[in-house]
């Protein structure tokens, strides 16, 4: 994935170790080619899942202190964090930058720009549940969004239904909404930025 960040609005989540470089961000997930051959596609997907797990373990270890602060001692979450950090300590023998480079090479193994399927390996549902038909997914149309013209996949209804369920147009009850832990968020700067648009 690609991260677009602004330093004008300070924001820091659990995985932001360097407090000097904290800003509000959006993630843009890369659409990757995947193999038409089912065996090669499966191997690509298993590798993607393995690299995602290793990268997350290394990040857990790097941010162990901040993660430990959000979990009660001896809770299931605390045990989960400790186990991921132990694995992260082992994987950290190789620097995160090297793991990231290897992962990037692996997810982009398929060079066929006309493959039948594409995947979003960095997406929330990961490789196997984010497989899409190229002809449907990679064709785009323009729609109005927030007063601007934006290019979106022609098959956005299928995409949103896969990610959020068939009722994706309805705002879920507060208890069912996705939550993100923020250690720091400059709400005043965020509100000013929104008002100025």
Predicted regions located by residue number:
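Conserved catalytic core of two-metal-ion nucleotidyltransferases
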Residues: 1-36, 44, 56-164, 169-197
């Amino acid at each position: 994935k690609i991260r677009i960040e602004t330093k004008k609005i300070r924001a820091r989540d659990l995985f932001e170790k360097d407090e000097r470089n904290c800003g509000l961000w959006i993630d843009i997930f890369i659409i990757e080619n995947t193999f038409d051959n089912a065996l090669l596609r499966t191997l690509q997907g298993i590798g993607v899942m393995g690299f995602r797990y290793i990268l997350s373990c290394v990040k857990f270890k790097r941010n162990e202190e901040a993660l430990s602060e959000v979990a009660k001692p001896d809770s299931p979450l605390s045990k989960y964090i400790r186990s991921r950090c132990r694995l992260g300590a082992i994987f950290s023998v190789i620097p995160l930058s090297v793991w990231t480079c290897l992962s990037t090479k692996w997810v982009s193994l398929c060079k066929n720009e006309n493959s039948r399927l594409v995947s979003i390996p960095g997406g929330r549902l990961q490789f196997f549940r984010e497989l899409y038909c190229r002809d449907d997914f990679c064709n785009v149309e323009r729609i109005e969004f927030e007063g601007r013209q934006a290019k979106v996949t022609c098959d956005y209804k299928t995409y949103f239904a896969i990610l959020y369920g068939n009722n994706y147009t309805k705002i879920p009850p507060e208890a069912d909404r996705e939550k993100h832990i923020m250690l720091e968020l400059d709400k005043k700067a965020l509100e000013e930025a929104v008002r100025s648009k």
